[in-house]
């Protein structure tokens, strides 16, 4: 999931840093109906709100992107995303066959280069040139339970 922290300052000892957390919201729901034929609808939304405090080196609304750290599988330039996944599964005795369609759309912002330094918004958000990238995926399921 989306999360991390940023460097917001240098402590009085001039060696240690002060940190600020990233803030985000993640909401997911899964609804299922039926037994022999199962209808499933999964949906979710994630919003990145940036860091609590401005990042170290912030000026004119931008800060060095190197002062922002995200978890390994996250993207620091992601602004928001949503996912919708309808699924149908037919249970036939010990067999089950299913089909799932997944639609995921993510809004990314671009980094800005200032004096040769890759920068992000002072609050840790990449909000320049926001654009959506959408992915479609279809998966099939065949299962035998013994």
Where are these regions (language model features)?
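Detector for outer-membrane/organellar transmembrane beta-barrel domains
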Residues: 1-78, 82
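Residues on the lipid-exposed face of transmembrane beta-strands in outer-membrane beta-barrel proteins
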Residues: 27-33, 86-90, 99-101, 140-144
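Repeated loop/turn-to-beta-strand initiation elements of outer-membrane beta-barrel proteins
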Residues: 37-41, 94-99
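Transmembrane beta-strands of outer-membrane beta-barrel pores
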Residues: 43-49, 92-94, 103-107, 144-146
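Outer-membrane beta-barrel and related beta-rich outer-membrane complex signature
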Residues: 51-57, 109-117
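Short acidic-glycine motifs
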Residues: 112, 128-131
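Low-complexity, intrinsically disordered Gly/Pro/Thr-rich segments
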Residues: 118-129
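Outer-membrane beta-barrel "beta-signal"
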Residues: 132-146
